[in-house]
Amino acid sequence: MKKQQLIVASIGLLLLAGLYFFGNTVSAKKIQPSPQEAKPSTEKLIDTKDILQASESKLDPGQSAYVNRLKNSVVRGDVKSQQLKAFQQLTSFWRDSVPDGFLPAAYYLGESAKLENSEKSLTFAAQLFLNNLRGQYPALKTWMANQAKELFERALTVNPQNDSVRVGLGGAYIFGGSTANPQEVMQGVQQILAVARRDSTNMYAQFMLGLGGIESRQFDKAIERLTRVVQHEPAHLEAIITLAEAYDQKGDKAQAIQWYERGKKFIANPEMIKEIDRRIKALQ
């Protein structure tokens, strides 16, 4: 698959990612690639230019002209406020006017956050990338992880004491890592463990370690961490569904069904409930 085609296909994996602009739910739904698309790619890494070109190739002439005007105003603008306004307009355009515009919207949101340089805006933009890392194509995952890392690192510069940001940065290393670079994954784990050891009640750290356990296929460790989270936060939907996933992948069908059923109680979206019901039926 050519790089341009890969990016366009990857954009389809993020159809529900816009939910994160308005509030966190469970992770954005991923559409599974075909077997051919799922094969590891030996092509060079995707960069921001590739992302923007692939996204802009789907615009109509009027939309293209509008985007180009805004991008040109960023290049010409020598005043920070002008650049910030243009980035905010580009974020709004891709978020609100383009159904598959998550990637450029998230990118421009990050650029806006860098100009604002506030802990809140940097963390929000970084979290948007982090929340959608799992399950992506390797090349796209690397690009998204790099965006998240830079934003989290900037937020830590603003406030080095923010443990949630440190956990998020660790997560970006874990989920953006690759088998070719396992030291990055371990770097992320150590970042989060440092927080968890210092504060055993930090459920965000426990949750991220649980996700990391699934990522590394250490299901017993994942189950231990995620169980701790749902004991402290019984309505933590993502932890509940992820715990069900851990039991599912471990092969414990009874426990997987039990946790999937529990998760349904906190879901209002009929389509999501149907997906879970299909999974439960497959396990029975």
Give the residues covered by each predicted segment:
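Structural signature of tandem alpha-helical TPR/SEL1-like repeats
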Residues: P99-Y107, Q136, K141-L151, T179-A194, ...
